[in-house]
Swiss-Prot record:
Stated role: NAD(+) hydrolase, which plays a key role in axonal degeneration following injury by regulating NAD(+) metabolism. Acts as a negative regulator of MYD88- and TRIF-dependent toll-like receptor signaling pathway by promoting Wallerian degeneration, an injury-induced form of programmed subcellular death which involves degeneration of an axon distal to the injury site.
CDD domains in the cross-refs: SAM_SARM1-like_repeat1 (cd09501), SAM_SARM1-like_repeat2 (cd09502), SARM1_N (cd24153)
Organism: Rattus norvegicus
Pfam family, one: TIR_2
Protein name: NAD(+) hydrolase SARM1
Per-repeat ranges for ARM: 60-100, 114-153, 155-193, 196-235, 237-280, 281-314, 315-354, 359-402
């Protein structure tokens, strides 16, 4: 106990020493190379004479580096000379502590840690770590991987990509122990950010397979790394890698991560990953089919980005927030046509705005173009969650928050047009538009010639800028008052940009049933679609639509009947329920699981209908799963209702047992006691595939209710639940 307190006091003192002012630090220059023969620190070299640095931050970074670099060099020297495993472990621990303390420094932690990480590489420490990752001692590999994960800044990722990917991939084949898996998943998380080529190499050589395998584990830190690794892979890997991720069922494996009830950070990172995948039109349908995408918007709406930002700051590996390149990737989500991508992108940028405002580094948002994208969401987004997050981010960044644009543009009066002109930066033309009495209808049908001749916009570049804004307005506008056949959404399904043509088409009296009869010349001259490629694509899709009837609302799609309904207790069974969903989907079963997205008034009806429609009823018996059913004689508990419905409909009931203790039959209401007569299968986290195979046998027509014979216990996985 005393040693623990002394060690904690030592760490606290050293933290304040590193972050405190340097004695005599009154000069604002970084010394250049010492021409008298001495050597200056490597991070100060490279200029002629002294180089000026910005006041405040530059001095703090310089001072922190001057204090910590000698300790780092000493620790690296001892590590290089160490031969015994114990000495190597002590050296790795010392270097790790120095780097971790640097990352935790407020405001300047990223710059100081960057300096230490560069020093480790330049002093040969990075190459040494790659060798230690191949050591025979497991503990050495674990510690080396833990340190490597901490120092993978951009330049170090370059080095690992050149000489160390094979080492990392060999480590990823060691699926155990969890301590090693955590760090290897963290290393892959960073390396997926390196480049599209590196992502492709990692995916092709098994790195993605390792991450997907670890998604079935229960360790929170490991699962967070997996979620972020998949998000980075999707963000930086390009469309080819995204297609490969979908083929390997990454969207399905993200479901249990996004469905977790214990870890909000994990859920958010998983939602980010699946939202990025959904932005790829080639795989969008497969991602939707996974069911994971439906979790994104409800989760984001329920969370506070300020609290999320505090969680990031409190963690050593995320305390500095994201760098400019990562932020740039998030900005791309704001420009997506998918609501889920806009929503999660706005949430992350709002949290990052909170972090950067504390650090005094908000300028990065202007540099990467985030301000305009956030303002556009505020102006045009019809989703309240997305718009609110964008407003909050702009306020944190000290930016003006624009007014929301009314979506029914065709119904605008002249005053709304004037407001829009001011908002997009064309105030100087307000008088001309007012003199010509331009309303929403005229605005949507405005031509280049009219803009130049009648409205006095002489500069062709200015007109291009104006039409860029007008195209965006047309794309986000609502045409519900004039678009009876929902032509806008059909055009948007072909390409989000095609929504801009809606008003021109409906103004000519066209709808979806007539579009295939129109010629390309009519689309050009009457409807104003100037781009020939767009005309060809629209006509081609319209003619194909003849063979695909319009969706009707009267019937129920045949695919709406699930093979399996999963019933579970939220507080103890959600993780297993989500894992079962993924495993069963991968084996071809359609699965219904309540994702808490149902409207309040329809909750009971929808659940009961789903139980009745499903062919099989899987009951997750986790710890205390039936406790709320006891004494529930009015059948108000949801699990109770689901069980009673399954029994009354004679469903094939398959109980899955995980840490469940049997109640006395008399303790349960009479209408559900029969559930205890069904044979159950004991869930094994270590042997998931074998357990799933047994579950599938129960689902494929072998009844689980058998009061005489009991169930097959050869797997050590089935448990008889018969009444005494």
């Amino acid at each position: 106990m005393v040693l623990t307190l002394l060690f904690s006091a030592y760490k606290l003192c050293r933290f304040f020493i590193m972050s405190g002012p340097r004695p005599g630090a009154d000069r604002l220059t970084v010394p250049g190379p010492d021409r008298s023969g001495g050597t200056s620190p490597w991070w100060a070299a490279g200029g002629r004479g002294s180089r000026e640095v910005s006041p405040g931050v530059g001095t703090e970074v310089q001072g922190a580096l001057e204090r910590s670099l000698p300790e780092l060099q000493q620790a690296l020297s001892e590590l290089k000379q160490a031969s015994a495993a114990q000495a190597v472990g002590a050296g790795l621990a010392e270097v790790f502590q120095l780097v971790e303390e640097a990352w935790l420094l407020p405001a300047v932690g990223r710059e100081v840690a960057q300096g230490l990480c560069d020093a480790i590489r330049l002093d040969g420490g990075l190459d040494l770590l790659l060798r230690l990752l191949q050591a025979p001692e497991l503990e050495t590999r674990v510690q080396a991987a833990r340190l490597l994960e901490q120092i993978l800044v951009a330049e170090n990722r370059d080095r690992v990509a050149r000489i160390g990917l094979g080492v990392i991939l060999n480590l990823s084949k060691e699926r155990e122990p969890v301590e090693l898996a955590r760090s290897v998943a963290g290393i892959l998380e960073h390396m997926f950010k390196h480049s599209e080529e590196t992502c492709q190499r990692l995916v092709a050589a098994g790195g993605l397979d390792a991450v997907l395998y670890w998604c079935r584990r229960t360790d929170p830190a490991l699962l967070r790394h997996c979620a972020l690794a998949l998000a980075n892979c999707a963000l930086h890997g390009g469309q080819t890698v995204q297609r490969c991720m979908v083929e390997k069922r990454a969207a399905e494996w993200l479901f249990p991560l996004a469905f977790s009830k214990e870890d909000e950070l994990l859920r958010l990172h998983a939602c980010l990953a699946v939202a990025v995948l959904a932005t790829n039109k080639e795989v969008e349908r497969e991602v939707e089919h996974s069911g994971t995408l439906a979790l994104v918007e409800p989760l984001v709406a329920s969370l506070d980005p300020g609290r999320f930002a505090r969680c990031l700051v409190d963690a050593s590996d995320t305390s500095q927030g994201r760098g400019p390149d990562d932020l740039q990737s998030l900005v791309l989500l704001l420009d997506s046509s998918r609501l889920e991508a806009q929503c999660i992108g706005a949430f992350y940028l709002c949290a990052e705005a909170a972090i950067k405002s504390l650090q005094g580094k908000t300028k990065v948002f202007s540099d990467i173009g985030a301000i305009q994208s956030l303002k556009r969401l505020v102006s045009y987004s019809t989703n309240g969650t997305t718009s609110t997050l964008a407003k909050r981010a702009l306020r944190l960044l000290g930016e003006e928050v624009p007014r929301r644009i009314l979506p029914c543009v065709a119904s605008w009066k002249e005053a709304e047009v004037q407001t829009w002109l001011q908002q997009i930066g064309f105030s100087q033309y307000c008088e001309n538009f007012r003199d010509q009495q331009v309303d929403g209808d005229l605005l949507l049908r405005l031509t280049d010639e009219e803009l130049q001749t009648d409205l006095g916009m002489k500069s062709s570049i200015t007109r291009k800028r104006f039409f860029r804004e007008l195209t965006e307005l047309k794309t986000f506008a609502s045409y519900a008052t004039c678009d009876r056949s929902n032509l806008a959404d059909w055009l948007g399904s072909l390409d989000p940009r095609f929504r801009q043509y809606t008003y021109g088409l409906v103004s000519c009296g066209l709808d979806r049933s007539l579009l295939h009869r129109v010629s390309e010349q009519q689309l050009l001259e009457d409807c104003g679609i100037r781009l020939g490629v767009h005309r060809t694509r629209i006509l081609s899709a319209a003619r194909e639509m003849l063979h695909s009837p319009l969706p009707c609302t009267g019937g129920k799609p045949s695919g709406d009947t699930p093979d399996v309904f999963i019933s579970y207790r939220r507080n103890s069974g959600s993780q297993l329920a989500s894992l079962l969903k993924v495993h069963l989907q991968l084996h071809g079963f359609s699965v219904f699981i309540d994702v808490e997205k149902l409207e309040a008034g329809k909750f009971e009806d929808k659940l009961i209908q789903s139980v009745m429609a499903a062919r099989n009823f899987v009951l997750v018996l986790s710890a205390g799963a039936l406790d709320k059913c006891m004494q529930d004689h009015e059948c108000k508990d949801w699990v109770h209702k689901e069980i009673v419905t399954a029994l009354s409909c004679s469903k094939n009931i398959v109980p899955i047992i995980d840490g469940f203790e049997w109640p006395e039959p008399q303790a349960l209401p009479e209408d559900m006691q029969a559930v205890l007569t069904f044979n159950g299968i004991k869930w094994s986290h270590e042997y998931q595939e074998a357990t799933i195979e047994k579950i599938i046998r129960f689902l494929q027509g072998r009844p689980s209710q058998d009061s005489s014979a009991g169930s097959d216990t050869s797997l050590e996985g089935a448990t008889s639940m018969g009444l005494p």
